[in-house]
């Protein structure tokens, strides 16, 4: 097994295991929006936000406190947008502090440069909010167009 040393110190390193160094896991991780080459910070945030907004809507709509009322879908929409807003504020706070260059590891040897600056993280946060809100609205509209009441009766 290979040991990837951190700053020349073998005590602080990353052990190459079959999980983190296999071609399948490397291909998967390198194709995630955070590590994909050629994307701007705004586009990275947009893709990550869309995924988060889309999957946050369902639990709030089906399992939220308004689950047995006619306002469950609207409550899920507003709750998920509020959660996306809170996450965007957290990303903006992270962008406001001194951000160092991300550490290169065995699975992510080519970390994008824009994730190492405050401006890049600010653009990521902006894209995250737009994408997250869009993902929530898309999930809401998708559930309104389909037979959401039938699904809710089956699950509830």
Swiss-Prot record:
The keyword tRNA processing does not apply. It holds the Pfam family PsaL. One of its GO terms (biological process) is photosynthesis. It comes from the Bacteria. One of its GO terms (cellular component) is photosystem I reaction center. Its main location: membrane. Keywords: Membrane, Photosynthesis, Photosystem I, Thylakoid, Transmembrane, Transmembrane helix. SUPFAM superfamilies: Photosystem I reaction center subunit XI, PsaL. It is a multi-pass membrane protein. The chain crosses the membrane at residues 75-95, 128-148. Belongs to the PsaL family. This is Photosystem I reaction center subunit XI. It comes from Crocosphaera subtropica (strain ATCC 51142 / BH68) (Cyanothece sp. (strain ATCC 51142)). The gene is psaL.
């Amino acid at each position: 097994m290979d040991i990837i040393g951190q700053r020349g110190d073998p005590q602080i390193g990353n052990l190459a295991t079959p999980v983190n160094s296999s071609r399948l896991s490397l291909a998967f991780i390198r194709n995630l929006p955070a590590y994909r080459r050629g994307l701007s910070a705004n586009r990275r945030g947009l893709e990550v936000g869309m995924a988060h907004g889309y999957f946050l809507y369902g639990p709030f709509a089906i399992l939220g406190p308004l689950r047995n009322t006619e306002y469950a879908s609207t409550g899920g929409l507003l709750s998920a947008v509020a959660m996306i807003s809170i996450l965007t504020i957290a990303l903006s706070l992270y962008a406001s502090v001194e951000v160092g260059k991300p550490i290169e590891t065995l699975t992510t040897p080519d970390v994008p440069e824009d994730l190492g600056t405050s401006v890049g993280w600010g653009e990521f946060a902006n894209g995250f909010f737009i994408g997250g809100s869009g993902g929530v609205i898309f999930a809401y509209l998708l559930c309104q167009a389909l037979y959401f009441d039938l699904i809710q009766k089956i699950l509830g």
